């Protein structure tokens, strides 16, 4: 066996093993997304999310898993069987994925101000129509969860919730905010979130009285709530994690470039046989 043949054989099995790993990973992602979609009780109780946005994300996971499996399968079969057509298709899909990521990165960088303004408009619109439109429930619950995770309230400040029609108080009452703004660390009491994500509520921390309606959990703005807006919290999160985000993006990009280089090198250096399927007929 010549040095070139040994190199091609090494590249072939290297591509096969790594794509087999990603095929298994895609299968796990697909199974995980399907499990979330099917399991409406125990998993939701564990995560603390309402089922509507969780169902949306589970579909995204399932589709991502299927696409990962399909791409990895092309790489596995194309490399192992030395099929130029599959290797070429594998290279083309990786190139399309890489170009899409580069395009998105450029658009986000150049249109950052416009994107921030658009996100602000969407958030403020969601706040203003909070619990008034059943079709927007998923977006509202997702924003509730964002406030809970980022430990913030409103976009610029909790005063943004004064525009919410369903939370507007009478002139004699103080303003209300959703329970997702509740700062449980101030009282070491997190049971308010049982009302936010589920229909039952056992108790709430001191000084925080609930305004209970059909499916709204709200508490006075003077209670123990987060005082920082989510715009500031999001900027802090991005600043603290920018190195990790850039590192992950660079790692994924380099991995895709490596697979593209190996696949096109293997494809170009195979014997000039354009249809290896004939041997299996």
Curated annotation (Swiss-Prot):
TM regions (residue ranges): 18-38, 60-74, 86-111, 242-266
Keyword Membrane: yes
UniProt topological domain (Cytoplasmic) ranges: 1-17, 75-85, 267-281
Keywords, in A-Z order: Cell membrane, Glycoprotein, Membrane, Transmembrane, Transmembrane helix
Biological processes annotated in GO: defense response to protozoan; negative regulation of myeloid dendritic cell activation; negative regulation of T cell proliferation; positive regulation of immunoglobulin production; regulation of defense response to virus; regulation of humoral immune response; T cell proliferation
CDD domains per the UniProt record, alphabetical: CD37_CD82_like_LEL
Quaternary organization: Interacts with SCIMP. Interacts with SOCS3. Interacts with DECTIN1/CLEC7A.
Function, in words: Structural component of specialized membrane microdomains known as tetraspanin-enriched microdomains (TERMs), which act as platforms for receptor clustering and signaling. Participates thereby in diverse biological functions such as cell signal transduction, adhesion, migration and protein trafficking. Upon ligand binding, two signaling pathways are activated, one acting through phosphorylation by LYN leading to cell death or a survival pathway with activation of GSK3B. Plays an essential role for clustering of integrin ITGA4/ITGB1 and promotes its mobility in the plasma membrane of B-cells.
Name assigned to this protein: Leukocyte antigen CD37
Gene giving rise to this polypeptide: Cd37
